[in-house]
């Protein structure tokens, strides 16, 4: 089953991998305006993201995400390490990963795409611009694109 506004039967499961509580709050606010039902799960570090995806420990009952929003600057495992493990694993490589980070470093951008990130977005620091970028992101990744089944 593909996820599309006209035939959606369930909420779009989104995993946000973000250690900054302010950015988590802003992302939640931005996603609330979606025309499609979304369910946001949040983990605060790279190791926890992998536990969530592998359904280990406290994440044994975690939903499989349709989309992952991944920060690069994370404790325990960096976003690039998480991305490398995701895209190397047959069960996770089709899940689209949107890198959503403060870094605008050319090396980070190149490495993310080399590791098969589906998109790289530098987080705007301005509140209004952040909401706009998240709105455009959700319109594309949630309301327009056909995502693989969870």
What is the role of each PLM region?
Residues 87, 110-114:
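Alpha4-beta5-alpha5 "output face"
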Residues 45-48, 78-84:
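Acidic catalytic/metal-coordinating carboxylates
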Residues 118:
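Short, glycine/charged-rich "phosphate-handling" switch motifs in NTP-dependent
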Residues 19, 71, 79:
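Conserved phosphate-binding and hydrolysis motifs of nucleotide-dependent enzymes
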Residues 70-71, 101:
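Active-site residues of response regulator receiver
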Residues 1-16, 21-41, 47-50, 54, ...:
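Non-catalytic signal-transmission and effector/linker regions of two-component phosphorelay proteins
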Residues 32, 58, 80-93:
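Short amphipathic alpha-helix used as the core "switch/output" element in two-component signaling
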Residues 20-23, 75, 91, 103-107:
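Negatively charged, flexible loop motifs adjacent to catalytic sites
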């Amino acid at each position: 089953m593909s996820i599309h506004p006209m035939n959606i039967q369930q909420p779009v499961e989104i995993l946000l991998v973000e250690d900054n509580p302010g950015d988590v709050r802003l992302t939640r606010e931005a996603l609330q305006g979606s025309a499609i039902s979304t369910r946001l799960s949040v983990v605060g570090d790279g190791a926890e993201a992998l536990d969530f995806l592998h359904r280990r420990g406290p994440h044994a009952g975690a939903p499989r995400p349709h989309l992952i929003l991944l920060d690069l600057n994370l404790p325990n495992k960096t976003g690039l390490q998480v991305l490398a493990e995701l895209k190397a694993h047959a069960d996770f490589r089709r899940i689209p990963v949107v890198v959503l980070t403060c870094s605008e470093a050319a090396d980070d951008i190149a490495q993310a795409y080399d590791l098969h990130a589906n998109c790289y977005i530098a987080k705007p620091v301005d509140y209004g611009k952040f909401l706009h970028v998240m709105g455009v992101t959700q319109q594309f990744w949630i309301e327009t694109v056909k995502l693989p089944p969870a």
